[in-house]
Each structure stands twice: as structure tokens, then as C-alpha cells.
């Protein structure tokens, strides 16, 4: 056992003495030691109950002959951190989470790991840390929140609240309407109810085979979710000493491909691209951002979920057959690109896992011959504005897929929010928000407030928004993020001026500023990088080490 390094032989008497102080006895030193990486925190709706979930898991681990050791990571709620300086810390928190998993697991030489994530950067951060440790690992998340219901009986979610703020600013709704939506959008614990980043990543854990069936869709705080916790705890005890189930044997090039296929089929958050690039990096898998368009071109988009379709939520996907039903339907397409021989932590191949899966409601998960689109719900665009690529959630486009408009430039999200409220962005414009990339922010803020304001003001289908920052999974519209190289690296987005013509063609994967080469050269020669004051030592360190979005925003130590 890996844990013998802290519990076997006379030299380890001091180590055992400390372990005895934690309640262990002689028999316990012959059992596998299992790390239980929790992310309990009171301020996140998807996490405030995870302390109780950890108790269920630890109890089941003890019943099955192993010793659990719980520890915690930090967590940031992107929705609460939204629209102020707190969002600068969201993406950097992914690195702290990864580092904490690596630190605790390796410092104590634990044999296996069960992770309890749920929201935002916590799932990818835990995946990255677990890949560094490389022991048998299972992910079991807290589960999605059920959808809210407004006074008109319509299903709503957190994105409805952000958009309601825009509608209120545009005087389309009154204060009572706004309060009703605010109070009813998030009715219970869980990760926000649509196909936002949290649910996207928890779904992809299932697709990669690192989580049991139902992980992405079984509701939080349900009896079914509690049974999934017990099942995961029993399974980690069964595989704790089995090298076949080391996480790097599960998360491979093939399983990452499967995750991206599911991502495209379900129109996941654009943040998944950033995180999957980082996960591939930690797994030692070469994943080029250019590969993603090939995957998208070969995958039908068969499930639309809020915010792309505001009548469908994760609870509906679960009732309609869940992630397995989506995979099973995609596998029916001749020449599909799923890798069905991949092994998952249940001990089954993907082919075996989906054998009995089927769609139970074709209005929620469509058949391939009735797909929303014959291509996936995410795309990578290239051009002089994004030589290294940028990301768009095509599943969320509300208007035209070709767009030509004049740039309205802002040098921060805060500046953009003020400008949008004052009416500076009008129909036909391209709203440009720059210096918000991993280096420029630093921290790559999410642009949910600007996009939601535009949508709520009735401009969602009438303008485009481009940024070197990123978007919440709750964003919809012609919203293009992760522009690389970013403004802080001197990318062309930094040289744009108000009135420049920008052309976007989603179907041809292109994004360009219609500027002559001599004009670009002239602007480069006169360009001065804005001096952005950063007071945080952590953010300064992050800014010096982080790569741009085309590489996943990982810390580049080479």
C-alpha cells in the first residue's frame, strides 16, 4: 500500500503515534487510507450541505473496511463574486484547489481519493490536483439545484435574475417583478440548475468515466443523490489498491475525446474548453484547441438546456435518460467519434455502460435525425483578432451566425457595465471588453453581467460581444470569449478603436477586424500598454505564471 510509507515498520512509530491520536488502532494500520477531498463552504449554494455528504461517504468507507481522512479545499462562488473585483480570484482559485489536493494527498501518502466537488472552479481544480497524485479516484458531486418557478409558473434559474436586472434597467419590468425573480430563481441547495459551468463539468466527469452514472444530473439533496454517494464510497474501497483505476488510466486522450463529444452534444459552457485544456495538460495528454472544431463537426447537438433553452433544466435531462442516454444516441450515428472501449471507474467500458440506456423523452433529448444542429454546441474561431483561437457557445446564439458591426471598446468589465447601462452599445455594435484575460485581469473575469444586461435590454440577438475574458455557462447570445493572444500580450484586440469594423462568421469559424496591415503596424508602433495597478501578491504571482486561454490558463513553469 502507498500508505505504508506512513504506517509500517519501526521507523514509522512516531507517524503511528500521531495517527493513534486521531483515533486509529492496530487493525486500522492494515487497511487502505482513503482521502475524502471535500469542498464544503457555507457561502456557496452547491456546497453548504457537503459536510453532511462527507459524513455519509466516510461512514460507508468505514463499513467497507477502509479508513477515511477528510480534508477541505477552498471554493469561490462565481455568481456571488460576479460584477466586482472578487471575480479576479475565481480562475486563480482553480490552482489553489489543485495544489491543495496534491499537497494533502502526497504529504500523507494516502492510497486512494474520493472528491466531493460541485460548483464553478472546484471540479476542474480537483481533477487537476488528482491527476498530479495519480491514485485510484472517484468524483461524486453535490448535484444540481432544481429549477425555480416564477409567479407566472415559468421555470427560471440564476441566469433569469441576471437578465432581469437588464430588463429592470430598460424599464421593461418593475421592482416587484425583479424581487419575485430574485427570490424564486434558486429554490434549494445545489449547483445552478441549467447547463452552466458546474453542471457541465460534473456531466463531463461522468462522460470521462471518473464518476458513476447519474453524477451530472441527479438532484442535490435527494435520496437518489445520497445513494450515489454510498455507491461511490463502496466503489472507492473496492478499487483503492487496484492500479487499473489510477486516475491517469481513466482520464486519457480517448476519454477526454468522449467528454468533448458529450460537451458538444449537450451545448456545455464555454468554460469547459478552458478546463478541459488544463485537465489534458495535467494528464500529460496533447490536446490542441484546433482539434475541437473537428469534434464539433462530427457531433450532433441533441440536448438544449437552460440558458440555451429556458424550459429545460438538469432535472429534465435526468428524467429523460441522463448523460448515458445522450451518449447512447450519439453512438448510433454511423462513423461517430466516441471511443467506446474506454474503461470507467465502475469497471465497465463505455460501450457496456450505455448498453441499456435510452431516451425517455424526445422533447428533452432529441434523436439524431431530429437534432437541433448537425454540429456541436461549441466552436473555436480563428482570424486576425484571435490567431490562437477564441470560443463561442453556438448553442446559445439567439440571432444571426454572421455578424458585421462597429467596435465599441472598453478596457475592463466594470467600464463595460457602466457603458452598457448608459446606452453606449447599440443595435448592430460589437461590444469589445479587453484586458480581462488570464494575464490582463488578472484572473479572466466572467462577463455574465454585461451579456445579461444586453439580453435583458433586448439587445441579446442584435449585438455581438467579444472579449479576452470568459463567460459564465449562464451566458447566451453572440458572445465570443477567450480571445488569444489576449490584450495584455499585445494581441490585436488591444489595438482596436471605436468604430473599427469587425466581422464574425461562426459557420466558417472566423473572426476578423477589417483593418489594413499598414494600419495595424502603425497602431502597434504607437501602442502603450495600460498600467494596471494590482495590489494582491497572489494575483501578481498568478499574472506572471499563467498562460493564455488557448492553453487552458494553466501556470506555465517552463
UniProtKB/Swiss-Prot annotation:
This enzyme's EC code(s): 4.2.1.9
GO MF annotation terms: 2 iron, 2 sulfur cluster binding; dihydroxy-acid dehydratase activity; magnesium ion binding
Keyword Cell cycle tagged: no
InterPro entries: Dihydro-acid_dehy_C (IPR042096), DihydroxyA_deHydtase (IPR004404), DiOHA_6PGluconate_deHydtase_CS (IPR020558), ILV_EDD_C (IPR056740), ILV_EDD_N (IPR000581), IlvD/EDD_N (IPR037237)
Magnesium recorded as keyword: yes
N6-carboxylysine sites (modified residues): 121
One Gene Ontology cellular component annotation held by this UniProt entry: cytosol
Residues that, per the record, bind [2Fe-2S] cluster: 119, 192
Top-level taxon in the UniProt lineage: Bacteria
Catalytic activity: (2R)-2,3-dihydroxy-3-methylbutanoate = 3-methyl-2-oxobutanoate + H2O; (2R,3R)-2,3-dihydroxy-3-methylpentanoate = (S)-3-methyl-2-oxopentanoate + H2O
Pathway(s) the chain acts in: Amino-acid biosynthesis; L-isoleucine biosynthesis; L-isoleucine from 2-oxobutanoate: step 3/4; Amino-acid biosynthesis; L-valine biosynthesis; L-valine from pyruvate: step 3/4
SUPFAM superfamilies associated with the record: IlvD/EDD N-terminal domain-like (SSF143975), LeuD/IlvD-like (SSF52016)
Subunit structure: Homodimer.
Role, per record: Functions in the biosynthesis of branched-chain amino acids. Catalyzes the dehydration of (2R,3R)-2,3-dihydroxy-3-methylpentanoate (2,3-dihydroxy-3-methylvalerate) into 2-oxo-3-methylpentanoate (2-oxo-3-methylvalerate) and of (2R)-2,3-dihydroxy-3-methylbutanoate (2,3-dihydroxyisovalerate) into 2-oxo-3-methylbutanoate (2-oxoisovalerate), the penultimate precursor to L-isoleucine and L-valine, respectively.
Protein family (similarity comment): Belongs to the IlvD/Edd family.
The protein, known as: Dihydroxy-acid dehydratase
Organism field: Campylobacter lari (strain RM2100 / D67 / ATCC BAA-1060)
Organism lineage: Bacteria, Pseudomonadati, Campylobacterota, Epsilonproteobacteria, Campylobacterales
Gene: ilvD
Amino acid at each position: 500500500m502507498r500508505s505504508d510509507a506512513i504506517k509500517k515498520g519501526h521507523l514509522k512509530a512516531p507517524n503511528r503515534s500521531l495517527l493513534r491520536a486521531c483515533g486509529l488502532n492496530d487493525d486500522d494500520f492494515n487497511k487502505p487510507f482513503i482521502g475524502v477531498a471535500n469542498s464544503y463552504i457555507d457561502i456557496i449554494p452547491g456546497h453548504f450541505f457537503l459536510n453532511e455528504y462527507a459524513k455519509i461517504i466516510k461512514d460507508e468507507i468505514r463499513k467497507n473496511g477502509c479508513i477515511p481522512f477528510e480534508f477541505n479545499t477552498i471554493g469561490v462562488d462565481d455568481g456571488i463574486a460576479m460584477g466586482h473585483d472578487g471575480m479576479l480570484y475565481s480562475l486563480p482559485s482553480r490552482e489553489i484547489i489543485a495544489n491543495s489536493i496534491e499537497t494533502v494527498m502526497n504529504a500523507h501518502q494516502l492510497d486512494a481519493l474520493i472528491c466531493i466537488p460541485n460548483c464553478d472552479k472546484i471540479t476542474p481544480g480537483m481533477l487537476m490536483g488528482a491527476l498530479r497524485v495519480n491514485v485510484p479516484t472517484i468524483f461524486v458531486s453535490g448535484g444540481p439545484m432544481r429549477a425555480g418557478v416564477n409567479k407566472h409558473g415559468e421555470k427560471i434559474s440564476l441566469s433569469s435574475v441576471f437578465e432581469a436586472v437588464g430588463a429592470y434597467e430598460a424599464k421593461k419590468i418593475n421592482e416587484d417583478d425583479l424581487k419575485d425573480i430574485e427570490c424564486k430563481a434558486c429554490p434549494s441547495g445545489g449547483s445552478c440548475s441549467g447547463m452552466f459551468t458546474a453542471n457541465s463539468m460534473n456531466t463531463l466527469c461522468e462522460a470521462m468515466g471518473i464518476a458513476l452514472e447519474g453524477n451530472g444530473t441527479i438532484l442535490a439533496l435527494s435520496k437518489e443523490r445520497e445513494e450515489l454517494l454510498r455507491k461511490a464510497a463502496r466503489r472507492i474501497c473496492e478499487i483503492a489498491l487496484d492500479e487499473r483505476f489510477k486516475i491517469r488510466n481513466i482520464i486519457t486522450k480517448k476519454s477526454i475525446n468522449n467528454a468533448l463529444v458529450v460537451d458538444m452534444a449537450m451545448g456545455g459552457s464555454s468554460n469547459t474548453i478552458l478546463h478541459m485544456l488544463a485537465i489534458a495538460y495535467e494528464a500529460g495528454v496533447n490536446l490542441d484547441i484546433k482539434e475541437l472544431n473537428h469534434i464539433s463537426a462530427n457531433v450532433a447537438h441533441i440536448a438544449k438546456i437552460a440558458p440555451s433553452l429556458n424550459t429545460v433544466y438538469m432535472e429534465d435531462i435526468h428524467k429523460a435518460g441522463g448523460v448515458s442516454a445522450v451518449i447512447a444516441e450519439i453512438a448510433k450515428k454511423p462513423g461517430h467519434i466516441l471511443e467506446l472501449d474506454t474503461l470507467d471507474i465502475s469497471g465497465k467500458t463505455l460501450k457496456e455502460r450505455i448498453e441499456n440506456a435510452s431516451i425517455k423523452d424526445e422533447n428533452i433529448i432529441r434523436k439524431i435525425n431530429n437534432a437541433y444542429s448537425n454540429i456541436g454546441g461549441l466552436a473555436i474561431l480563428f482570424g486576425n483578432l484571435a490567431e490562437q483561437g477564441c470560443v463561442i457557445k453556438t448553442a446559445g446564439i439567439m440571432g444571426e451566425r454572421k455578424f458585421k458591426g462597429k467596435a465599441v471598446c472598453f478596457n475592463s468589465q466594470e467600464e463595460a457595465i457602466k457603458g452598457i447601462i448608459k446606452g453606449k452599445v447599440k443595435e448592430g455594435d460589437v461590444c469589445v471588453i479587453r484586458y480581462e484575460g488570464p494575464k490582463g485581469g488578472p484572473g479572466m473575469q466572467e462577463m455574465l453581467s454585461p451579456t445579461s444586461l444586453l439580453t435583458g435590454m433586448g439587445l441579446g440577438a442584435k449585438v455581438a460581444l467579444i472579449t479576452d475574458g470568459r463567460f459564465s455557462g449562464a451566458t447566451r447570445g453572440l458572445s465570443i470569449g477567450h480571445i488569444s493572444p489576449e490584450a495584455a500580450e499585445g494581441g490585436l484586440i488591444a489595438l482596436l478603436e471605436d468604430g473599427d469594423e469587425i466581422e464574425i462568421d461562426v459557420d466558417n469559424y472566423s473572426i476578423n477586424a477589417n483593418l489594413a496591415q499598414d494600419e495595424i503596424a502603425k497602431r502597434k508602433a504607437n501602442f502603450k500598454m495600460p498600467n494596471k495597478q494590482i495590489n494582491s501578491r497572489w494575483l501578481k504571482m498568478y499574472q506572471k505564471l499563467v498562460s493564455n486561454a488557448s492553453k487552458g490558463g494553466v501556470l506555465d513553469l517552463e
